[in-house]
Structure formats: C-alpha cells, structure tokens
Amino acid sequence: EALEKDAEIHTLEINDEMEDFIRKYVSQSPDKDKIKLYFGDAMEIIPALDESFDLVFIDADKRLYSDYYDLIFDKLPAGALILADNTLWDGKVLEPLHPADKQTAGILAFNDKIKADQRVEKVILPLRDGLTMIWKK
C-alpha cells in the first residue's frame, strides 16, 4: 500500500532453495509486477544493475557488508537511505574478536567504514541485533 505508483522493489537472494517460496509469495502480491527478483550472487548482480535506488536493505553475508556498501553507494542519489541489519551482531561487536570469526570481523569492518564515511549521516539503532540507518548526503 505504501509503494508509489512508479516505484519498484528489487530483491536479491543467493539461496536457490528459497526461489520457489519467494516466487509463490511475490505472485500473490498486488504489486507483483513491480517486484524484480534476482537469484544468485549479489557481488555479480549488483554491478550489472543499471538502476538508482532510494532505499537499500542489507541483510546478507556479514563478511561482505563493506563490499555491498561499496557496490551500491554510487547507485544512490543524495537523500537515499541504506538500512543494514545485524550491525550489533548479538553483542559480539563489543567483545574481543576471535580470529576465526569472519562474520563478526565483517560487521566490525563495516561499522568502522560507515563511522569514517563523511559522505553519509548514520545512526545505529539498538533493535535486536542492531539496525544501522545510513543517509547519503
């Protein structure tokens, strides 16, 4: 109901086991013609998209959050919003990092990148595992 007349939703899923499930529910949506589905590796799909996005939600491989951010940043106009999920990672971002914990290392690197990026305004909301809101200036 909140989707504007000319708006589109683009969604990426790497888990091919979810494809039938996702297609089933998208086909039931009154906005099904506005939903673009991509199945595969976001690191390959995102660079190929000739699109501009007003809102991006990142909830994927935590090791690659910084890479996803870099891939989408130039596809965002000023004022666009990025929502990054799990940025407090069950509190693990506050504990000493275990050398084998690549997921937490990825979240820490992402949080550091966002903190240092002067092109954006940002805030981490302490909701569940953390949600970071990032506005492009």
Short names for language-model regions:
Residues 1-137:
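S-adenosylmethionine/decaboxylated-SAM
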